[in-house]
Amino acid sequence: MKPEFLESAEFYNRRYHNFSSSVIVPMALLLVFLLGFATVAEKEMSLSTRATVEPSRILANIQSTSNNRILVNHLEENKLVKKGDLLVQYQEGAEGVQAESYASQLDMLKDQKKQLEYLQKSLQEGENHFPEEDKFGYQATFRDYISQAGSLRASTSQQNETIASQNAAASQTQAEIGNLISQTEAKIRDYQTAKSAIETGTSLAGQNLAYSLYQSYKSQGEENPQTKVQAVAQVEAQISQLESSLATYRVQYAGSGTQQAYASGLSSQLESLKSQHLAKVGQELSLLAQKILEAESGKKVQGNLLDKGKITASEDGVLHLNPETSDSSMVAEGTLLAQLYPSLEREGKAKLTAYLSSKDVARIKVGDSVRYTTTHDAGNQLFLDSTITSIDATATKTEKGNFFKIEAETNLTSEQAEKLRYGVEGRLQMITGKKSYLRYYLDQFLNKE
């Protein structure tokens, strides 16, 4: 090799194969890469809590139907039952007496309904349709209605008679005053005619009311001006007096002719009375119909208990027992024995239920994604993906604090439904958002949520 090449190679090695080029530069490049990755890449933020598998709906509440001792009990947790399967059989007791009581009550209610329908028809047609006196007092109610209607008619008739009498008296008074007005007007005309005769010197008919005054004037000398003035003044005084009386008569005439209107609301009052009674009857019929349905239902239930003395499954499903009564041989009537859940295989969905503290619940909302993982069998875990469907508005108080109930409904495959059981516990992971790795580690360092 030529010596100049050796010198060049040595120079290259010294310049580029040093500590800076071998360590610092690669580390700097790595740091830049990691910083860029931490800035761009995102990490899912999540919460985790325990959750249980619950039914999406409850098919039926199985309640004790007797206070008697349980002889046969086929209730088992998570047991798959078919419609009609025997669940509980009781020792026969007082069901027979109760069945008779329901039957007697039902007969009485039906008779009461029949009598009430008689009352309804009687009210509608205004005639008594009761074949005989009833023990519920409905016929007496109809008689009371007839009496009230009669009182209304009598009151209205009496009122109209009084009004007619008053109107007749008013008409008669007005007619009499009208006659006085006519007579007074005739007198005024006579005196006005007499005045004109005195003033003009013409003759006056003898039948004129002022003829005597006219004659007196004529006898005193009609040529005397003073006599003429006195005669005219006397006539005018009579006219003024008559006009004053006429004005009074006219005022009396105007006030005396008022006619009162006859009472015309009888039909509406009678219709209102009938409507009130019919409305009350309608309400009682509705109430009786409800009572009859209840009595028929009770009679049917007691009859079934009397005949069979057992509880059977109302439909296909899975049993969930009430832990408070699962080991009891005597359970009070009406107490919950178990609940019937839909089969997971047939329903194809389930509900995941969990509880979160008030601190964590603020970080989630309806629609957030969740993942459920079973924990009872580490070698055969199930993973279910869903979204939050509901969050309780109020917290549930416990010894450990206040917790909010959250639910997430999830669909199941046939394989998942076969392996899953109601009540199975697992971990529920809720994705609350995303952060870059840089922001995540900064928040961790600064102890931020």
Swiss-Prot record:
Residues 42-449 are extracellular. The chain crosses the membrane at residues 21-41. GO terms for biological process: establishment of competence for transformation. It is a single-pass membrane protein. The keyword Transmembrane applies. It is found in: Cell membrane. The keyword Nucleotide-binding does not apply. Residues 1-20 are cytoplasmic. Keywords: Cell membrane, Competence, Membrane, Transmembrane, Transmembrane helix, Transport. GO terms for cellular component: plasma membrane. Required for induction of competence. Belongs to the membrane fusion protein (MFP) (TC 8.A.1) family. This is Transport protein ComB. It comes from Streptococcus pneumoniae (strain ATCC BAA-255 / R6). The gene is comB.
